[in-house]
Amino acid sequence: MQSISPAIFGRTHHQTNNSYATKVITRTLTILCATIAILLLSSGEMWAQGCILARSPEQGGLPTGEGGILEPGHFQITVGERHQFSYQHYVGDVYQEYRAQDRTQVENRINLVTTNLTYQWTPRISLEIDLPWLFATRKSQNSPVKYSATGLGDTILGANVWIRNPEHAPGNNLSVGLGVLIPTGNDDVQNTYDSNTTGVGAPVEVTAPVDYSIQPGNGGWGLVMQWSGYQRLNKSLTFYSDGDYIATQGGTNGVQRGATLSTTQPLNNYVAISDQYLLEAGVEVPINKVRGLSATFGPRDEGVPARNLFPNSNDGFRRPGFAVTAGPGGQYVHGHNILTAGIYKAVHRDRTSSYPDSVYHTHGDAAFAQYVWLASWTHRF
């Protein structure tokens, strides 16, 4: 759910009448966001923190409060972009430098474009639908083969409710929500490629599923639990926090890994349907000289647990782990439009041990990104 800052809408403190500066900022930010989106979309053909498949959307943690609430009977549409390039391999929290030295790094280039439509049913209750679209590529440094996947991801239908009536809660509030993850995304995108990478002899064409980290779909249903809250610390500083957890049905999605089935590690023969989560927090400060502009800073923690919340089955191949990132962001509101952007740098990455890893006494690796780029545009009507 894309949330909006209480320090922006209906703000009466520290406003400026410098309309020329406002127009310049509006044009500059609009051009900047459009340029970023074009560059990111053209740089590669996902939801994911590299190989571990933590799929969280655009920046969504900005607080909602007095004047920033969506009025009953009104809609808002948000289009968000997430971009990252994952190539640094970790086993646990140990960086595998030899992968770079040997040029065996696996590189995932990911773009996730999400469209979210929210309807404010009552002052406290809102309904939403979230439609992601994935563009992703994957290749190994020492191989000419490049895999790609594009398509609609898994859809989320949800409802959110404020604990307190927002009209009477200008200083703090908490929203909780429930939703359902619908497996509308394809979890079995296949590529045809030449497996003869020696450059000698005739081509050997192979058709097989791409790695699950760039598949648009997860292959299973899920229960979405989310929350968002804020606390005004003073007239110019607001603390915000939010998170979500997607508890899936578990088991496997039936998509086979590799050309042949393993007899030594049968639990890894098929792809697991994994849970995922996101936690974030931060502070927001208005930029007093420009009406509608504010800056944010805070950390994010997103990842895939080794074991699902519902104890159905943890069989199947997954790359569990998490990445903690932190960085600055910004939000600009003009009329019925809101622009947000953020750049988050990794401060801790950890590829944890999966359930099959614990059974077979192994510990696989995963590729992580150094930076995550987020941007969104929201229109209210």
Residue ranges of predicted features:
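Sec/Tat signal peptide C-region and signal peptidase I cleavage site
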Residues: S43-A48
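Residues that define the transmembrane beta-barrel architecture of outer-membrane proteins
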Residues: G73, R109-V113, A149-T155, N172, ...
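Short loop/turn motifs that connect adjacent beta-strands in outer-membrane beta-barrel proteins
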Residues: Q49-I52, G65-H74, S86-Q88, R124, ...
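Outer-membrane pore/translocation modules
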Residues: F135-A272
